[in-house]
């Protein structure tokens, strides 16, 4: 990629970084709780509840950012001064899902920290880095900036697939893979609608966001209720 393309890619990461900020706040509190719960009898149930809630909340937040990506881009990106950055929003939805996968990986790394298997964080991250480099070399020549965005998502997704299997060897807890797949697919569909802007696209986005909230809200409310009773 040239300097302009690299600049567009850099600008398009501004909104996805908001997801990372939200996750960091949660992760700081969660990491301590994970260590405290490591020796408890119900730690598997605890991990299941928190991870399910965390995923649900992050999927809703990601959907919200994708739905409002055009508005947020106009606020955060000065396309009047730098008109070449006006197209940055086209790549943002893929990067949002990529950063979301990174956040899930960060959560799973807490399992390694709590169970003292931190080397697994290293080698799974190494695999992701290798995938990212290889895919960037291949996809940038084919799709340019979008290729780089897809490579970012794919590398974090590969890391997630490895960690969701490996980390649960040390703390077995159930994961709803079908729900994860449905949520991820829904985010990509919302992203396609934002980019392509088909007829009635605003209505489609509104319906899609409501679906994401309703599909995930129950997990959040149930866990919050259980945590209150636990206290």
Describe each PLM feature range.
Residues 1-18, 29, 33-36, 70-83:
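Helix-terminus/linker motif at the lipid-water interface of multi-pass membrane proteins
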Residues 16-52, 108-114:
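Helix-loop junctions and terminal segments of transmembrane helices
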Residues 5-23, 52-56, 98, 133:
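Alpha-helical transmembrane segments of polytopic membrane transporters and translocases
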Residues 31, 41-68, 86-92, 178:
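Interfacial transmembrane-helix starts/ends
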Residues 62-67, 133-137, 187-201:
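Hydrophobic alpha-helical transmembrane segments in multi-pass integral membrane proteins
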């Amino acid at each position: 990629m040239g300097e302009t393309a690299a600049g567009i890619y850099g600008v398009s990461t501004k909104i996805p970084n908001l997801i990372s900020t939200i996750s960091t706040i949660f992760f700081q509190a969660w990491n301590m709780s994970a260590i405290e719960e490591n020796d408890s009898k119900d730690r598997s149930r605890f991990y299941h509840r928190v991870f399910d809630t965390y995923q649900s909340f992050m999927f809703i937040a990601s959907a919200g950012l994708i739905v409002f990506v055009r508005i947020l881009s106009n606020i955060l990106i000065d396309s009047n001064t730098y008109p070449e950055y006006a197209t940055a929003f086209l790549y943002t939805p893929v990067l949002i899902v990529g950063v979301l996968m990174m956040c899930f990986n960060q959560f799973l790394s807490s399992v390694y920290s709590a169970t003292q298997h931190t080397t697994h964080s290293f080698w799974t991250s190494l695999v992701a880095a290798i995938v990212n480099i290889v895919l960037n070399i291949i996809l940038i020549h084919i799709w340019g900036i979008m290729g780089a965005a897809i490579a970012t998502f794919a590398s974090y997704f590969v890391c997630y697939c490895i960690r969701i299997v490996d980390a649960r060897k040390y703390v077995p807890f159930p994961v709803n893979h079908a729900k994860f797949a449905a949520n991820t697919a829904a985010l990509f569909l919302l992203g396609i609608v934002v980019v392509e802007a088909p007829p009635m696209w605003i209505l489609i986005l509104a319906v899609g966001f409501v679906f994401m909230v309703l599909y995930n809200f129950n997990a959040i409310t149930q866990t919050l209720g259980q945590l209150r009773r636990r206290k």
